[in-house]
Amino acid sequence: MSNTQQLHDFTTQVRRDILRMVHAVNSGHPGGSLGCAEFLVTLYQDVMKRNPGFSMDGKNEDLFFLSNGHISPVFYSVLARSGYFPVAELATFRKLNSRLQGHPTTHEGLPGIRMASGSLGQGSVSYTHLRAHETEAD
């Protein structure tokens, strides 16, 4: 999707999702999510090589490491609208037994999530570890 208007429309829908999710449960951090909307939409729709079919190994696709897990509303919306899981699931955000909690985790098997994110800054460490492991494997 490289059409500027399409990216704008996609981003507008993501922002609506963020506000609906956070408002429905009266919990979450809308500011960070709203501020990252263009960035994540552009990455997932125009820059990254990705696979909504998803496998944990991430072969033949670009990997995204989310450090600040409190922006999960934008991450969940972009993943859902990119085909990783049904958009209707966004309505379960932060509800009991939902896969969409306040910080993304891998234990619920949510497509598009490869690592739990909680501590700020852990994404850069995870990426560095992955690159070091790939270098050793070569």
Please name every model-derived segment.
Residues P30:
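Histidine-centered catalytic micro-motifs
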Residues T11-S27:
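N-terminal capping segment at the start of a domain
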Residues Q6-L7, I18-M21, S33-R131:
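Cofactor-binding active-site loop characterized by glycine-rich and histidine/acidic residues
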Residues E134-D138:
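Single conserved hydrophobic/aromatic residue that forms the stacking wall/gate
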Residues M1-D9:
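Generic start-of-chain signal for non-secretory N-termini
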